[in-house]
Amino acid sequence: MAVRILGVDLPQNKRGEIALTYIYGIGCGLSSKILTEAGIDRDTRIKDWTDVQVAAVREIISRNFKVEGDLRSEIQLNIKRLMDIGCYRGIRHRIGLPLRGQSTKNNARTRKGKRKTVANKKRVTK
């Protein structure tokens, strides 16, 4: 039986602890806490979960954590707020440069994007 939690299909043959990390906003540590609270062994494969266990995990996640679309939209709103108030981090977001003090003279290609080459100036002959 395919297990679907918050719009994400969990892989059937993975351990519960690993499979829950396929949900945006849940990492290894949080998945362990969720399974402990639900009373499910971390090493149990998803295909071996019962309907009651799936419902318990679903309920714990929806009650206690902000994940998937809600988390993505909250992050986007936080970035938009930074840009609107015009703080340093907001300005760096706006112009697409690193936010946390990294040097941009040589590297920062991930944030800056592909190189934009500038043609050399032609020398004037005397």
Curated annotation (Swiss-Prot):
Keywords, sorted A to Z: Ribonucleoprotein, Ribosomal protein, RNA-binding, rRNA-binding, tRNA-binding
Lineage: Bacteria, Pseudomonadati, Bacteroidota, Bacteroidia, Bacteroidales
UniProt GO MF annotations: rRNA binding; structural constituent of ribosome; tRNA binding
Protein name (Swiss-Prot/TrEMBL): Small ribosomal subunit protein uS13
Residues annotated as signal peptide: none
Function text: Located at the top of the head of the 30S subunit, it contacts several helices of the 16S rRNA. In the 70S ribosome it contacts the 23S rRNA (bridge B1a) and protein L5 of the 50S subunit (bridge B1b), connecting the 2 subunits; these bridges are implicated in subunit movement. Contacts the tRNAs in the A and P-sites.
Organism: Azobacteroides pseudotrichonymphae genomovar. CFP2
GO cellular component: cytosol; small ribosomal subunit
Matching HAMAP family: Ribosomal_uS13
Membership in a protein family: Belongs to the universal ribosomal protein uS13 family.
Swiss-Prot/TrEMBL GO biological process terms: translation
InterPro entries for the chain: Rbsml_uS13_C (IPR027437), Ribosomal_uS13 (IPR001892), Ribosomal_uS13-like_H2TH (IPR010979), Ribosomal_uS13_bac-type (IPR019980), Ribosomal_uS13_CS (IPR018269)
